[in-house]
Amino acid sequence: MTATTQKDSSIVLRFLAAPMDITYGGTVHGGKLLEWIDKAGYACAAGWSAHYCVTVYVGDVRFTRPVAIGELVEVEARLVNTGRTSMHILVTVSSADPKTGEYTEATRCVTVFVAVDGDGRPVAVPTWTPPTPEAAELQASALRSAQVRADIEASMKDQVYTSAGTGLERTLRFLAAPSDVNWGGKVHGGTVMRWIDEAAYVCAAGWNRGSAIAVYAGGVRFYRPLLIGSVVEVRARLVHTGRTSMHISVHVRSGDPKTVERQLTTHCMMIFVGLDEQRAAPVPQWVPVSDEDVALDAHARHLIDLRTQTDLLDRELPRAAR
């Protein structure tokens, strides 16, 4: 395997937020930012591995503020660790008024990509060695975060969702269109995350009976590719409320429209807050009724505790040389 130069371990995408990027609320937020994150992460992973790559995990996405239409956007993806076939990539989205060029962060998260060959089988990637003490600290944090991620995945996988649950549930259903295709002929991981955000918003706004905005997305696990032309079902269920927050579990399933069989492709936990004049506002409190409700409410609280055990996203990050 040929060596990959250190400069290939990061990439910055730069563009203007266009009117077509607008989401609910009149700004660019949630699902569109997730699409940008996936594209930058893919570019970084493909550049490092020299292979086609697939998204397998996106975690701890913290939406700190929306991006305004017309702002200059920078999406920086940097490699922070490699496994045998996987690449852990830290992605930061920042934006600025073009007249000032003063960037502020809008969101940050960790993504995991796996390099695959022409038959879709995982292939080995070059080992990344931290070039600086700061990079070594990021790698150490990424390794600690990997265990937390495994705990989150295990907890999410153990939960049961049946008709016994009473939390508000909303489902979006549609066909995966040719315009959703990625470089490998499947549906973009970022597109799937946008669908997740949209379904969660419908659920949150319906429960709150008012405005809501995404503040967190986590545990986004991609189990299998989603094919163009498939029937897609995105089901969002309320599983916990805080004073201003709504925790929503989202499952994406897909299948051949000629059959009724649907397979799980993606699972995620989203957190929305209620809004009143663009400020966080109290939301109606959900009270678990069934045993399943109680278990899912406890699960959401457990995930809150797990998220406090990682420090990778709390570190100060220098902006890359532009």
Regions found by a protein language model. Give the residues of each.
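Short coil/loop residues immediately preceding or within conserved phosphate-binding loops
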Residues: V12, V58, T171, A212, ...
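Catalytic cores of nucleotide-enabled group-transfer and carboxylate-activating enzymes in metabolic
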Residues: K39, A177, H188, E198, ...
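Catalytic strand-loop segment that frames the active site of acyl-thioester-processing enzymes
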Residues: M1-H29, A140-W195, C203, N208, ...
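Hydrophobic, helix-prone linear segments
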Residues: M1-E76, Y103, W286-P288, I304-L306
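A cross-kingdom feature marking solvent-exposed beta-strand/loop segments within repeated
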Residues: T55-E74, S94-K99, T107, I213-R224, ...
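Active-site helix/loop of acyl-thioester processing domains in fatty-acid/polyketide metabolism
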Residues: G31-H51, G190-A212
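HotDog/MaoC-like acyl-thioester-processing domains
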Residues: T2-L13, V67-I69, V80-A150, I228, ...
